[in-house]
């Protein structure tokens, strides 16, 4: 199971939080892929969110050294296989990525 974490590049995540879907083009332009790994165990998005909230370098070295922020925060996206979850004020919510 492939896990990816995307950090939001913009300054106001409230705009993106209003909807429950995002286009794949927006995902590639306003988000940076900062971390990717493959797991054999089944993980859920909340466990990954907690891991990123609590640790300085969760799961090892990030893909990108230059980031807008260093901790997972509001508006960031966690991808687990083909499912996408957006970090909300508390926890995560499932979103749809459309072509």
Q: Could you tell me what each predicted segment is?
A:
Residues 22-80:
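Short, conserved turn/kink motifs that form compact alpha/beta structural patches or helix kinks used as
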Residues 67-99:
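Short, compact, well-ordered microdomains
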